[in-house]
Structure formats: C-alpha cells, structure tokens
Amino acid sequence: STIKWLEGKGVKKNQMVLYGESLGTGIAVEVASKSKFAGVILESPFTSMQDMGKKLYPYLPISILQHDKYLSLNKIKKVKSPILIMHGQADNIVPFYMGKKLFDEANDPKVSYFPEEDNHMMEYNEELIKTLKNFLSSLSNL
C-alpha cells in the first residue's frame, strides 16, 4: 500500500494526510479509524455504502444484498486525527446531508467547507484553496 511505501521511505503516519474523494472517503475513514495521521480530508463523503445503495436503488433490499465494510458514520468517532470535510450542498450524487452528518459526528479538531453552489465535483476556487491551506498549516507534523 501507499502508506507502507511511504513508511519505507521514513515518513511516519503522523506526517501523512489522508485524502479521500467520494467512494474513496470510505477507505480514508476506514484507514484513519485504525491509526493516527497528521490529518484527514474528505471530499463529498458518504455515511455508508448501504445508505448510498438505498438512495440509488430504493426499491431493492440493499441491507440484505450488500454487506457494508465502509460504515463511515459508525467509524468517524474512532478517527483521532484533525479532519476537514468538504461537501457541495448541490451534490446530486452523494447527498449533502451525509457529509454534514459525518462532520457533526467527527471529533474535534474539525473544519468544514460546505459551499451552496458546488455539486459532487468541488470547484477548486480561491475559497476552497484558502480552506485547504489553512487546514494544512494548522497540522503540527507537516
């Protein structure tokens, strides 16, 4: 994995920032729930794969068909790293309420960036870049 490769190069986990986008946020939360990192950034995160399945296929028995390993809402409290959650309120793929719910459940220190107009793919405008820079500069081991 990338983490093991970086550790082989002498980089410690507390010097790494995990970044997950959309489906990748489930993996980032899973990994961050097991070890402390310098920080975690989640872009357009979902609460669980089952929640997403129920949203996309409301007519199917998703909880029976899908065994969910990526229960981000259940695991977010185990994340002990500083966290930045970014989610566009106009997201038409992963509902905004999922990112907001994860933010509400996350431990401090935490930062949010919830622009009204952004959809699933965030616009990397001046405000978002400023938020990222401020978050990264607040991390102690970078």
What does each model-found stretch correspond to?
Residues 5-57:
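Primarily recognizes the serine-hydrolase "nucleophile elbow" in alpha/beta-hydrolase
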Residues 38, 45-81:
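Mobile cap/lid helix-loop segments that gate and shape the active-site cleft of serine hydrolases
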Residues 72, 81, 95-104:
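Short alpha-helix in the alpha/beta-hydrolase fold that links the catalytic acid
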Residues 78-80, 85-91:
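Short beta-strand/loop motif that positions the catalytic acidic residue
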Residues 89-94, 120-122:
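Acidic catalytic loop of the alpha/beta-hydrolase fold
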Residues 100-123:
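Catalytic histidine neighborhood in serine/cysteine hydrolases
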Residues 123-138:
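Post-His helix in hydrolase/transferase enzymes
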Residues 140-142:
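Alpha/beta-hydrolase-fold serine-hydrolase catalytic core, especially in secreted/extracellular enzymes
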